[in-house]
Amino acid sequence: MSKGHSLQDPYLNALRKERIPVSIFLVNGIKLQGQIESFDQFVILLKNTVSQMVYKHAISTVVPARNVRLPQQNPAGEGESED
């Protein structure tokens, strides 16, 4: 798994499993709301009254309705910023 996915996948998976409502802002400013039904490397399925397939390259920001707790995966400090 590439380093770029080491945070993205667990974060999206937590949103999906806990059925946390999200607001997704697209790069063109449009705001979509719903729950993450599924996702893969390129798209997110967002469910509200209908299911929408949203391409990840079009997403600017994902804002959950409440805090998300991610499972601890590397207690040795891996995953922290490398400044």
UniProtKB/Swiss-Prot annotation:
GO molecular function, a single term: RNA binding
Stated role: RNA chaperone that binds small regulatory RNA (sRNAs) and mRNAs to facilitate mRNA translational regulation in response to envelope stress, environmental stress and changes in metabolite concentrations. Also binds with high specificity to tRNAs.
Family indicated by similarity: Belongs to the Hfq family.
SUPFAM superfamilies, sorted: Sm-like ribonucleoproteins
NCBIfam families: Hfq (TIGR02383), PRK00395.1 (NF001602)
Keywords: RNA-binding, Stress response
Cellular component per GO, a single term: cytosol
Keyword RNA-binding in annotation: yes
HAMAP family reported in the protein's UniProt record: Hfq (MF_00436)
A single GO BP: regulation of translation, ncRNA-mediated
Annotated ranges, domain Sm: 9-68
Protein name as it appears in the record: RNA-binding protein Hfq
Quaternary structure (record): Homohexamer.
